[in-house]
Structure formats: C-alpha cells, structure tokens
Amino acid sequence: MEKRTSYCGELNEAHIGQSVVLHGWVQKRRDLGGLIFIDLRDREGIVQVVFNPEFSKEALEIADSVRNEFVVTIKGTVHARGEKAINEKLATGKVEVLAEEITILNSSKTPPFYIEDGVNVSDELRLKYRYLDLRRPEMNNIFKMRHTVTRTFRNKLDALGFFDIETPYLTKSTPEGARDYLVPSRVYPGNFYALPQSPQILKQLLMTAGFDKYYQIVRCFRDEDLRGDRQPEFTQIDLETSFLTKEEIQAITEDMLVDVVKEAKNITIDKPFPRMTYKEAMDRFGSDKPDIRFGLELQNVSDVVKDVDFKVFQSAIENGGEVKAINAKAAAANFSRKDLDALGVFVANYGAKGLAWLKVEAGELKGPIAKFFPEEKATELKASLQAEDGDLLLFAADKADIVAASLGALRNKLGKELNLINEEELAFLWVTDWPLFEYDEEAGRYVSAHHPFTLPKEEDIPLLETDSSKVMAEAYDIVLNGYEIGGGSLRIYKKEVQESMFRALGFTDESAKEQFGFLMDALEYGTPPHGGIALGLDRIVMILAGRNNLRDTIAFPKTGSAVDPLTNAPGEVSEAQLAELKLETVKKETN
C-alpha cells in the first residue's frame, strides 16, 4: 500500500499540480457519459476524484466497479476545477483529483442508512451500527472537537503544574449518592468492588500525600435513572489542589474554560465569569443552574396579592408559601386559552396545583382571575411586574420549592418557544454559597447537597449537629447555558469536623468508621486545607458542539435504558462464570 501524502479534506489550490496518494471511503459515485466522479471521504473531509479514460482507462474500469463505502487508495494529480464546477459548499470545492490509479482495499455491504449528515434514522439503529454513524462528517467533527477540548485541558493543567495521577477503578462501595455499579470478587466470594462514582476520596488522599496539584481525565460510573444529559458512564476533568482559596480554584477553572472555548470555537469569553448565590438563582430563575441568556425572571408578588380575594393566593401565603409571577413580554397574543391550559398541565409535572394567568389589554387585566383585582390592586400589580399592553402574566402559588421548580421549568420552556435564546451565545455562571444539606422528603432527613466531604462555612460548623438546615457550604457550581458543567468545593480536612458531618448525616461513629475509616485515619496525619472541582467533559463538548444529547459526544454510548445496541450489553453470563464467582441469579417472575 502506498503511503498517504495528504488527507482528502486538506486539499486546496496550493496543491494544484501536485501528485497525491489518498486513502478513504467512497461517499458517492456518479457515472456521467464516460467519466466517473467519486467523492472520496476521510476524517478530514471530502474531495472529488475524476476518472477519465484519456488519462487512465484501467483506473476508470476499476472505478466502475466500486460502490458506496468501499475502501480505496487513489493516486492522482490535483487540478483546479472549472469556474462553473466550483462547489462552494465543500472546503475542497475549488480543486479535484484526476485519478491515475485506484486500488480497492475492501468492499462494503450496502449500509443500513446513508452515511451523510441530516440522515433520518432512529437512535436505536444509529447506535447498533455506531461505527457507520461515526463516519458521518457531523459526528466526525464532534470527536475532533472533543479531542481539541481534552488536549486544551491537559495542556493548561500541565502548564499550571498539575500532576496527572490515575486512581483505581476497582474500589470500595461507599454511600455517596447514586447507586454503585458492583463488581464481584472471585478471590473473596460474597465481596464486591464498586466502580467509582468519582475519585473524590482518593484525590483528597493525594492531597494528604503532598502532591499539591492533581488532575485526571477520568471515567466515572453511576447506576441511576437516565435522561438526555446523563449516561451510566461519563468522563470528567477532575482536579484537586492544596493551600488555595475557592476564588483561586475558580480562577484556574475560568482560565481553562476560556482557553477551551477559544481553541474549540474561536470565541473569546470575558473573565471573570458572572456569579450569583444559590438563593439568588432560586429566587430569580427557579433553578440552581439558570440559563442567563434570556430574561423571564421570576418575581415575588406575595406582598401585592396577599390582600386580593383569591383563595389560591391567600391559602399559599397563609401556609408559609409564596406567589411568584413571570411576565412574558408581548406574548399574550401567542397563547390561546387552550395553550394556557396546556401550560397548566406542564407545571403540574413539577408539583404545581395549577397556573393562574392574566393578559394586559388596553391597560386592563384580562383573564379568569382579573375579577379579583380592583383597579388599585391591578395598577399595583402592573407596576410591580412592569406590565404593559400585550404582556402575559403567569402565576404559581405554593411552597417556595414547588413555585421555584414549576416556574423555573416553565421559564425554560417559554424561553425556547418564544425564541428568546441566542443559540450562539455561551453564558457561563458561578453559583455559590450553597446550603450544605438538602431535605430528602422520601428519606425524611437531611442529606448532603453535594457530598459528605464538603467543608461547611467556618461560622456554621457549630450548627452541624444542632441545626443542619442553616449550615452553608464552601461549595460552587459552574453553569453553562442552563447546564451544570461542574461542581466543586473546599473539603473537610480536620477529623473532628468530618466526624461531626457524618453524625449530622445520621451515621453512628461505628458505621462512619466502617465505611470511611481509611479517610478518617488519613485526616490524623496532617491533611492540608484543600479543594477542587470536577468538570463534565461530555456535557461541555455537547454544548460547544450544539447538540442536545450526551450520546452524540460519547463514541460508544448507552441508550436511555442503559443498553448498548452495538454489543447487546448488558448480557447474561455462563453458569460456569457465576459458579466461579459463587453467585446465583434470581429470575424475575413474570405473570
């Protein structure tokens, strides 16, 4: 096989007159009155190859037998296309290759779908033939971008003096949040390793070991319910540092992300990134990961409506809840009564008991609840919401968390439906000052908002075991376009604080020692103050590539039901394998 001289997609006018050797796949073949044209594709793009009997009759005869997706080597000379033959849609569209020789390296069956962008095919089929799906230029470009992003992170962290250190995949199962993927031990029957949900504890131990700055581009595993931006295995940019403040860790993160966006998209992002507290994010946007590319902010109108004779509002306020509204500017005409009923059904998914609404027409409030607002109150409400003719006012009344969840989700829905979002914009945001705990209704107790190793604010440490709800954390999340792309914090580095944290979470001293004894021991040997962050590589690439599903940014992903259609994983194993592991399977009973 002759050595390749160029990639197909790299050829341009500078190559005119040069002899080239190309390897690639036949994208398309056209037979036009004695001439054959082949679009040859490789990872860098497509170039047109011309087979002319006057130049090489033998090459033309071989080209006549090739079909789509055949793998070939072509030798020829680069020529300029004629003025009328220039293809502006193609990067190589001003040149073509006049073929002298063609060698068929391998044939191909007819693919189950066209290998081209925009092909209408089910996700299931795409994943079953993922190796074909990845040939499509748009998919190829995503993984070029992923490589650029990964390389940029590595280069930046290396320049900042971080050590790339690997942590084990076979580790101990600890109660950190989601369910673990378990791996049975053959040597110790009845015992299991766990695949890591993150290298959290181990990277903290590397700080105890004195490495000062650690990073790892690491695979993590969580056995949880899936959705569009979740996968059972995912990759994070994981880093940890000693002796730095949270502001310094955030500055390092910003520097990395600015470089990544510049390299991947050639867009310059301003620093420092905007920031807001968790409370402000929930109050204004109803979300702890707000998309700040558009308005539609939530506004508290409890004081305005507390005296109106509308029982839904009155009841919510009397029971310690609140009434909030969104003013969708100039949107009243966009929504019929039927549309508004549908929005009511939508917010019910988030716990809301309904969605009240008003329209502003000719200076007056119109709608089902307008009768509850006498002129003075109507004027006060319009002033409070800066409402004008044509505006649509949407209200939720309930407990604060339900109001936030329902109006926050509604805000995101309206932002898309009303075309308020600039899809080209990249809006980074820090969300800071998180509560250390959140209340789990199902468990009936407080659980870690992030993880049990997050450092409480110093002034709140005495409250750990007495008033958990008031303890704030030295935690920070980084958000991009409404997605959480990373979470970090300063960590607990003193044993007595970690013991107090475990007790606050309901661990007995004995159970804490059993689960985390190795960490507690390490904290007795001079662990330095430390902190870090983990950034979701798959999600960052998803956003930069303009996709809406993580599957597109992972080479061999799972479906929404955690199945791999390509390999048919997960699958059953043999009785011999189970016997070796001293395991039995329990068959699910079916009616």
Swiss-Prot record:
GO biological process, alphabetically ordered: aspartyl-tRNA aminoacylation
Start and end residues of each stretch annotated as Aspartate: 200-203
Primary location class: cytoplasm
Binding site for ATP: R222, D223, E224, Q231, E484, G536, L537, D538, R539
Chain residues that bind L-aspartate: E176, R222, H450, R491
Its EC number(s): 6.1.1.12
InterPro entries listed in its UniProt record: Aa-tRNA-synt_II, aa-tRNA-synth_II, aa-tRNA-synth_II/BPL/LPL, Asp-tRNA-ligase_1, Asp-tRNA-ligase_1_N, Asp/Asn-tRNA-synth_IIb, AspRS_core, GAD-like_sf
UniProtKB keywords: Aminoacyl-tRNA synthetase, ATP-binding, Cytoplasm, Ligase, Nucleotide-binding, Protein biosynthesis
SUPFAM superfamilies attached to this UniProt entry: Class II aaRS and biotin synthetases, GAD domain-like, Nucleic acid-binding proteins
Locations listed in the record: Cytoplasm
GO cellular component: cytoplasm
Molecular function terms from GO: aspartate-tRNA ligase activity; ATP binding; catalytic activity, acting on a protein; nucleic acid binding; transferase activity
Reactions catalysed, as given in the entry: tRNA(Asp) + L-aspartate + ATP = L-aspartyl-tRNA(Asp) + AMP + diphosphate
Disulphide-bridged cysteine pairs: none
CDD domains in alphabetical order: AspRS_core (cd00777), EcAspRS_like_N (cd04317)
Similarity annotation: Belongs to the class-II aminoacyl-tRNA synthetase family. Type 1 subfamily.
PANTHER family: ASPARTATE--TRNA LIGASE, MITOCHONDRIAL (PTHR22594:SF5), ASPARTYL/LYSYL-TRNA SYNTHETASE (PTHR22594)
Subunit and interaction comment: Homodimer.
HAMAP family per the UniProt record, alphabetical: Asp_tRNA_synth_type1
Function: Catalyzes the attachment of L-aspartate to tRNA(Asp) in a two-step reaction: L-aspartate is first activated by ATP to form Asp-AMP and then transferred to the acceptor end of tRNA(Asp).
Protein name: Aspartate--tRNA ligase
Classification lineage: Bacteria, Bacillati, Bacillota, Bacilli, Bacillales
